[in-house]
Amino acid sequence: MAFVGYVVWQRNPTFDTITCKIWNIVDAEGKERITAFTNPDGQASVAWLDKDEKKRITAGTLADGEASVQCLDKDGKGRIVAATLADGQASVQLFDKDRKLRISAATLANGQAGLKWLDKDGKLRIAAATLADGAGVQWFDKDGKARIDAVTRDDGEASVQWYDKDEEIRIAAATFADGEAGVQWFDKDKKVKIAATTFPDGTVILPTKDDNPPKKP
């Protein structure tokens, strides 16, 4: 490997400075494998090239603190792209060989975050997010119908719901901040068939014979 550097010579009345602008690392055949440059204002970038001199990894920073990195396949298609912004936001995306988005994740400056996973047809299959007071996740079938929905909150409350292929709720479970918890199972006619509840004092209500959910005595 060989190193080639380009410099700019700048003279002023009190001292001399040398500012490196571009670096190139070449292989034994004289092909560029790594290139990098910096600007006096803080911008910088670096790229790694394969033996065919195609860029495979690139990264850069801007003067305001923003930065990005990208991984490319042998055909020059971006497969992974990540970036951070000056205000603290950040994101990452993953693409398949057909350049279709498969995974996307992002965080905001306030700590909120989200993630999406898509199938090969570009349909959303999993979505997850964190909010200021909790978090949630959803799972979708191949027809784009929500099948599972779960949520948690910072106060200890949480719930999960399961839906059938007709998007009718079949199972619902929840816990509350005071320690109460319950679960219900519905038949295809939306009637409650099983309902159980627990209370903070240790009371447990088991399923009843009718279609109505139990009530605390």
Residue ranges and their predicted role:
Residues 1-12:
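Single-pass membrane-anchoring alpha-helices
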Residues 13-40, 45, 209-217:
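N-terminal segments that cap or nucleate solenoid repeat domains
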Residues 39-203:
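Thr-biased low-complexity repeat/linker tracts and other Thr-enriched repetitive architectures
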